[in-house]
A protein has these predicted regions:
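Short acidic, Pro/Gly- and aromatic-enriched capping/linker segments at domain boundaries
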Residues: 1-12, 268-285, 512
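Carbohydrate-binding surface patches
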Residues: 241, 635-653
Length: 653
């Protein structure tokens, strides 16, 4: 049994292959956190210490005991209004404006299998691979019931957490803050590792000592963002790649998020991850339930490499659902850097001919095939084929490409609309904007309100009408701006659920299409997206040297098989740097591998080198994608970037 309950001590113990997680319902009914770390068979309630500390108040139920305070005790799910003045996981406001919820234990259930979340991506597993613990806490006066969900995947050494918030009262309540996970550490001196960046330079590792106070980061952009990835590592100060304690949290969500790390007045550490409380105020009527997206937690006593391996296994085996997750994927060439908007059907066919001669498996027609789109100023929202530009129907073009012996892929950006489009002229209210105000433009486009079903249905029907015209093998889903015009506190969350609904319908209808996520490169590179698409374009920056840093940071949580990586032309279109074709090829092989250039401009020698690159990649592709990935150097600290893939059987490298 991975989950054990001791009824005498009221201790819950969650066991994985190498870790133990423990919590206890105390005599007053509060759920206290005891331990998370290396595997143990001991009860850890001895870690709880009680002391009378000035200005740390005491629950009324504690009577005259001034040593009992929620301001100092480690808690499993702390709330506002209980005398805990640290950062909290949950804040709920009632109709009178009062913000106070005191959660006490009511019941629990242990069951085989992994819980699922309605409308949200989550780790999945068979009944013999996982167990679920559901603990019900409640505040009858506030009319709130909270269900803490724990999924234990023993073999992966991961524990997942999510929360259901139920309005059990007769009035309305408003959720002002909702995190999925809280980890209170009584002892230890920690560093916080986060992954910051910008467009075309995502997921740079930054390690900071956690001093007193709060270190926080997140996104308010409507997506998980280029700027901060929804992932964090809490590590002992001497932890390295191959030694030392470290804890990871990874948010399975593609929208606004928040991570808070706090060292309190008595040197205890609290780590929180969940939904951002900025631009968030979610109304919940009587009888309704709100679901907080999932956090995947993992612990390693053997440094960052082992922690990464645990996350890589979890994501590839229990997050990605696509049939392509463990298949050989096609080496593709994308038309974007080869032609940008300036192409015809003949251009794509010529690209296919060149690709076939090089051993490339697939040609992808990027932005510019629909509406009247010859630049980025028009036609988003008008998903009909520009047959004049292509010189025929899409079906005819697909057949011509397939006739060259290569597969066919296409680019879409379903969440966006241009003001210069038929869709916007007919439905201007479908674009997200604050009533009475002019919207914020970005890349000359607005965001469609995917929180509305009629909007999603219209775009879905348009996209399906395109996909049904021929055998499309691959789709690149892009999303090229941040959300600015947030007109309501529920919009950002409901928008993401709308995107997930659209994606679920799409992959269900077209299970044989390989879907690759993208948001200006890696602006939505998260576990939520990987639930629907087994790979994501890692960055719009294809410079080989910069990519070593981007892919290095990405590898701390995400497997190589998820990283879209291509060989591009030189001078590089983003940086102007010139690197050898060999260097570009090696870097791209630490990902899904493909090309982003015009092969007609290559010399015969370069073409022959590409043929050899593709042969090499195909020889080692399954080893790279399915093997164990090791970071050998840090491109941020060392003069060289080096990595290694080792087979699961440890007989190849």
């Amino acid at each position: 049994m991975a989950i054990i309950f001791n009824p005498n001590k009221k201790i819950f113990t969650l066991q994985t292959a190498h870790t133990t997680y423990q919590m206890q319902v105390d005599r007053l009914g509060y759920l206290l956190h005891l331990y998370y770390g290396a595997k143990s068979t001991c009860d850890m309630d001895y870690v709880l210490t009680y002391a009378d500390r000035g200005f740390s108040g005491n629950p009324y139920a504690a009577g005259m005991n001034r040593t009992y305070s929620l301001d100092t005790l480690p808690q499993e799910y702390p709330t506002l209004g209980t005398g805990d003045f640290r950062n909290i996981a949950l804040d709920i406001k009632n109709e009178q404006g009062t913000e106070s919820v005191e959660l006490l234990y009511k019941s629990h259930e242990i069951r085989d299998g992994k819980y699922a979340l309605k409308g949200l991506p989550a780790v999945w597993a068979s009944d013999d691979e996982a167990q679920t613990l559901e603990i019900v806490l409640g505040d009858d006066i506030a009319g709130v019931e909270v269900h803490l969900l724990y999924g234990v995947l023993e073999a992966c050494d991961v524990i997942t957490r999510s929360v259901l918030i139920k309005n059990t009262g007769s009035g309305n309540i408003t959720i002002e803050k909702a995190h999925a996970a809280c980890l209170d550490m009584v002892y230890g001196d920690y560093d916080v590792i986060r992954f910051y960046g910008k467009h075309a330079m995502e997921r740079n590792l930054e390690r900071t000592h956690l001093g007193h106070g709060t270190l926080s980061f997140g996104s308010r952009r409507g997506t998980s963002s280029h700027q901060y990835n929804p992932a964090v590592i809490l590590a002992q100060r001497d932890t390295t790649e191959n030694a030392g304690d470290c804890y990871g949290m990874l948010f399975v969500y593609s929208g606004n998020f928040s991570c808070e790390a706090e060292k309190d007045q008595i040197n205890q550490t609290r780590l929180l991850m969940g939904l951002s409380d900025e631009l968030f105020s979610y109304p919940l009527a009587a009888g309704e339930t709100f679901t907080v997206p999932e956090v995947i937690m993992s612990y390693s006593a053997d440094g960052f490499s082992q922690l990464s391996h645990q996350y890589h296994t979890c994501i590839s085996e229990h997050v990605c659902r696509s049939r392509f997750a463990h298949e050989v994927r096609p080496v593709l060439i994308n038309s974007w850097e080869a032609a940008y908007f300036d192409f015809t059907g003949d251009t794509i066919v010529d690209l296919a001919k060149e690709a076939a001669s090089l051993g490339i498996d697939m040609v992808v027609m990027d932005d510019g095939w629909f509406g009247k789109r010859d630049d980025d100023n028009s036609s988003l929202g008008d998903w009909f084929v520009n047959e004049k530009k292509l010189g025929g129907t899409l079906s005819e073009l697909i057949d011509r490409v397939h006739a060259q012996g290569v597969k066919f892929g296409i680019w879409i950006e379903p969440e966006m609309v241009n003001e210069d489009s038929n869709l916007y002229r007919e439905h201007p209210d479908w674009a997200i904007q604050i009533p009475g105000k002019l919207p914020v433009r970005s890349r000359n486009q607005l965001i469609l309100d995917f929180s509305r079903k009629e909007v999603r249905d219209n775009i879905f029907d348009q996209i399906c009408a395109v996909f049904d015209q021929g055998k499309i093998d691959y789709v690149k889903w892009d999303m090229n701006r941040s959300m600015a015009d947030v007109y309501a506190g529920n919009l950002a969350y409901d928008y993401v659920l709308g995107v997930y609904d659209f994606m679920e319908r799409l992959v269900t209808r077209y299970p044989d299409i390989l879907l690759e996520g993208c948001s200006g490169g890696g602006g939505r590179f998260d576990a939520g997206m990987l639930y629907y698409s087994p790979q994501i374009w890692c960055s719009d920056n294809t410079d080989a040297i910069n990519r070593t840093r981007i892919q290095y940071g990405t590898s701390f949580f995400y497997p190589v098989s998820s990283m879209g990586a291509h060989v591009s032309a030189v001078p590089n279109h983003q940086t102007g740097r010139v690197t050898s074709l060999k260097t570009r090829g090696i870097t791209a092989m630490a990902g899904t591998f493909g090309y982003e250039l015009n092969p007609a401009l290559l010399s015969d020698e370069e073409k022959e080198e590409i043929r050899e690159q593709i042969k090499t990649f195909k020889k080692y592709e399954m080893l790279i994608n399915e093997g164990t990935y090791w970071r050998l150097t840090s491109p941020f600290e060392d003069e060289v970037a080096a990595w290694m893939s080792v087979s699961r059987a440890k007989d190849r490298a």
